[in-house]
Amino acid sequence: MAGAERARRDRRNRAARGWALGLLVALLVQFGLGMYVNLFAHIPLNHPGHRAKNFFAGSYHNVTWAETSPHAPLILAFHAGLGLLLVLGSLWLAVLAIRGRRAGFVWAAVLGALFILGAGFNGASFLNYNEDANSFVMALLFAAAVLCYIIILALPRSAIRE
């Protein structure tokens, strides 16, 4: 591998490590917001999208309601908004990892993005159907995403052994 190509990949992998750390911190904040919503926020059952027959249409209405309605708890808006940012950030980290071409980074980043996406779908499903199982799965997927980003931070800085 040429020196310039190796330097480019190392830069991308350093950026991926930075993004992994940022996402890890954001996930911990998200967990705290989610626990507050779960324990203390009152989410009315008559909001737009609740019990929708079409999951995706209902989810769209739920998230729109959570982000824009004066009747939605403000903490829910923060939780949903940070969740959307986590999805975008995790997808960007996956792109950086793929471009950096380190197998461990790629696997952990792609799995982390899938776990965050799955947690988001379960959050939308919780607003749709108000089932505790969705909240439980969201917590499990959070833990799995945290593990993925810890793995990225734990991997050696360079794939090339000196």
Q: What residue ranges belong to the model's regions?
A:
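Polytopic transmembrane helical bundles with strong interfacial aromatic enrichment
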Residues: 2-162
